Amino acid sequence: MPYFHRVDAPRVLSMGLVALDVLCIAQEPERTSFRAGGTAGNVAAILGALGWPATLAGPAEESLAYELMLNDLTRCGVEYREMHRAAVPVIVEELEHYARHSFTFDCPACGKALPRYHRTYRADASSWVCEDVHTDVFFADRLSDEILELAQSARRSNAFIVYEPSDPSDAPWAPAMLALADMVKYSDERADGLSWLSDGDHLEIRTKGAAGLQWRWARHEIHQWQSMASIHVANVVDTCGAGDWLTSGILIGLLERGDTRATWSGVTAMEQVLRRAQQLAAWSCGYAGARGALYESGPAMARAIVQHLETSVMPDPLPESNAGFSCAACPMTS
């Protein structure tokens, strides 16, 4: 079960890359784990498991992939809303020794192509969110006409807007989204492909992998890049999903004070938020899969890290589905 549900916890609506993650571990060939994934899916699931009222919007269809994804989101306390009828994307992570992983979009058993992400949404998306979903935080890692319209609607309701650009094809919508955003986070390795990135008064975070991160926040007169080293992890199992844990930790540190306009100011205060978020991300690297920590240690352990709790916490791992399909694609797309 999720760690807790506080009535005053910020509400988050997440949109963009939503998928079913299939985790195959070389040392455990008999085990296949099925979890909700994609950046938007992971952020919603982490925050939902840690107690935020979380809503995730994405594709839906009658398939085993959809059922497995939906069941996992339910365990994390996430409400799922259908935005359009389409196949749920399926991403296979193959985890090998020494924390090496690779991703494939073909079934490793039969070679069949797996469903991929497509930028297609319902025409009435704006009325759907305005009538049924009230949010304090709007998160997106992919853009479209509909997602931008929903972000604008959220902004009019004074929501905190988060954009994580990673896809160059966001270009037609990116300038408008950057103008709306309160927080923009992206990886150094993808920045060169995002030629439309521009300065703004938002909190800007540039992650650099093992080299740490840089940040600046013009709104609070912090115009120069501030650098922070990474946190050493003694036993790295899998770095997949660490960025999603970092995002979740930052949002918890910034917004659980009850002010979704983020009145944090000053380098020291912001670095404390970022450092605890880095600790959360580093901790997640000790587990297999993007959110493996939730299924092996649990939400209470994550809470203790991000809140820097001194008291000992007992593990409370979430249950998960470990199905023994011999073919990752065919049962999911049939």
Kindly give the residue locations of the regions a language model identified:
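Short pre-catalytic strand/loop immediately N-terminal to key active-site residues, enriched for Gly-Thr
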Residues: E28-G37, A229-G241
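Histidine-anchored nucleotide/phosphate-binding helix
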Residues: T39-A49
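Structural alpha-helical scaffold elements that stabilize or flank donor/cofactor-binding regions
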Residues: C130-E131, A174-M177, L197
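Positively charged, low-complexity intrinsically disordered leader regions
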Residues: M1-E28
